[in-house]
């Protein structure tokens, strides 16, 4: 199962934090690889801190590291810097799909048409696209797309506090998007991810912070993980 994250041109949606959280949860069930395809190396920093090279952009196979933390079985393809040969990374991902049961591709915000084209080899490999969006008009407009016939799971994420009325409004917007997508014969689901201040403190030395997230957050992430593990 290959999942690619997508937030359109909008950064700051909490996409990487959510990709890390889901990967940690899924790794308790199946062999998991989180591929950090962003120039900033956000997923790498969350799970491994200042990881040394070689990085994904230089040598995909040698970029694989295991997260050495109690109870975790997740691997990370570490990265720093922009990918210069996305096709080579895509070939590596195809090979890794035979070794890992679940791959999460953390793709950065795609700020222009050139960026979309550059990362298309990774998006094409995905069985499911995880759209991470916020309850605000700019984020919704930037991210609610379909990808051919690929399954879409939308996470309406609150990386900062939002009024319930606002969240409820955009939940209805996303519900309508999923309904219209289903009418086209494309599988679409959505999950509401509530704001949780503990998640912002996640880091390689603070994995135990996940023991202090709210029941609502934990339940939402578990539901998201369950949807992503579903074949169709």
Where are the regions that the model predicts?
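Walker A/P-loop NTP-binding active-site region of P-loop NTPases
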Residues: 2-61, 102, 107
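Switch II (G3) loop of P-loop NTPases
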Residues: 77-82, 92-119
